């Protein structure tokens, strides 16, 4: 997701959503790897460098040394490799072949303890093995691509070993429900807060990092999921919620022209940021 305007909302059939989204991400993966926004040069130059997302997560993530982790919807692997640099043995899963190839190249160049597997997130347990992981990690901008949060929660539970932990930091569903930035600065709910059967369709020419690439695949199909729906899905899959923290910042300029860039790399509403939960961290464990 990125600092771009959502220009179109239509109701359509779900059937082809995965292929449409995959074409979009396949095209963007090499552009993202070449963009300063993903800081590939810093990963190569500094063996202790971590992504802004993972640095933000550190206080709640804690010590993960020696854990076996899987990062769902890992894209080009910068967060996955950051987790490996913290001492975990990581597996990244993504449905985009070009993204996985970029991630594998970065892992090889940096010597990170990270492997990458091409798979749809809903098929992740078949791709990497059930009950194998101490940690399931999911980062910003992942859940909006999934039509069923209940199915996702079942996948998470199947991946975790007994006693294993889910760690997710995501854009807040209240933020996802807001319309485009307005000159008057009002925050207006325009898109669904709750999961719907029908996707939202967005037609966006650009992407969320700086690039001169002109993209051909501009359509995406997306879904929002209410915070209660996410928690209920995890509880229904047999996990126990151990933590929920809402944050007043997010790692991208979600509302262009209405946010201030912080020294941490996070963005926050310039005017009365306490009006809106920007993101959240949710943690859960599987019974021992």
Which sequence ranges carry the predicted segments?
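Conserved alpha-helix/loop element of class I SAM-dependent methyltransferases that forms part
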Residues: 37-68
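Class I SAM-dependent methyltransferase SAM/SAH-binding core
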Residues: 67-126
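A short acidic, Gly/Pro-enriched loop at the edge of an enzyme's catalytic core
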Residues: 126-136
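A short SAM/SAH-binding and catalytic strip from SAM-dependent methyltransferases
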Residues: 134-150
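A short glycine-rich, Lys/Arg-flanked "PGG" loop and its adjoining helix->strand segment in the class I
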Residues: 150-165
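Conserved class I S-adenosyl-L-methionine
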Residues: 165-208
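Acceptor-substrate binding/catalytic loop of class I
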Residues: 170-185, 213-229
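Short alpha-helix
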Residues: 220-244
């Amino acid at each position: 997701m990125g600092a771009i305007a959502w220009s179109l909302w239509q109701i359509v059939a779900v059937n082809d959503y995965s292929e449409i989204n995959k074409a979009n991400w396949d095209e963007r993966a090499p552009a993202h790897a070449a963009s300063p926004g993903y800081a590939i040069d810093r990963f190569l130059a500094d063996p202790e460098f971590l992504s802004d997302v993972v640095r933000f997560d550190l206080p709640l993530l804690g010590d993960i040394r020696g854990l076996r982790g899987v990062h769902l919807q890992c894209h080009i692997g910068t967060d996955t490799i950051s987790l490996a640099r913290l001492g975990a043995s990581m597996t990244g899963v993504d449905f985009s072949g070009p993204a996985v190839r970029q991630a594998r190249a970065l892992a090889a160049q940096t010597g990170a303890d990270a492997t990458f597997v091409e798979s749809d997130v809903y098929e992740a347990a078949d791709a990497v093995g059930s009950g194998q992981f101490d940690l399931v990690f999911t980062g910003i901008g992942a859940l909006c691509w999934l039509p069923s949060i209940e199915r996702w929660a079942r996948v998470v539970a199947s991946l975790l070993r007994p006693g294993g932990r889910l760690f997710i930091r995501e854009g807040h569903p209240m933020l996802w429900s807001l319309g485009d930035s307005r000159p008057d600065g009002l925050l207006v709910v325009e898109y669904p807060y709750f999961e719907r059967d029908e996707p939202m369709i967005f037609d966006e020419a650009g992407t969320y990092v700086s690039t001169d690439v002109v993209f051909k695949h501009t359509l995406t199909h997306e879904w929002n999921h209410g915070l209660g729906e996410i928690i209920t899905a995890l509880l229904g899959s047999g996990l126990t919620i151990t933590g929920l923290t809402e944050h007043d910042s997010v790692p991208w300029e979600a509302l262009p022209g209405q946010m201030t860039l912080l020294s941490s790399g996070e963005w926050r509403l310039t005017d009365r940021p306490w009006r809106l939960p920007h993101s959240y961290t949710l943690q859960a464990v599987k019974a021992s």
